[in-house]
Swiss-Prot record:
Processed by the macrocyclase-peptidase enzyme POPB to yield a toxic cyclic heptapeptide. POPB first removes 10 residues from the N-terminus. Conformational trapping of the remaining peptide forces the enzyme to release this intermediate rather than proceed to macrocyclization. The enzyme rebinds the remaining peptide in a different conformation and catalyzes macrocyclization of the N-terminal 8 residues. It comes from the Eukaryota. Transmembrane segments: none annotated. Keywords: Toxin. It comes from Amanita phalloides (Death cap). Disulfide bonds: none annotated. This is MSDIN-like toxin proprotein 3. There is a cross-link at residues 11-17 (Cyclopeptide (Ser-Pro)).
Length: 32
């Protein structure tokens, strides 16, 4: 999932896959 999130999100905004995973989870929870 880290690679997928890194690809979906801007690499310059989320350079670290771990951070992108955390933000992805937050965005998913906010949308639902």
């Amino acid at each position: 999932m880290s690679d997928i999130n890194a690809t979906r999100l801007p690499s310059f905004f989320f350079p670290i896959p771990c951070i992108s995973d955390d933000i992805e989870m937050v965005l998913t929870r906010g949308e639902r």
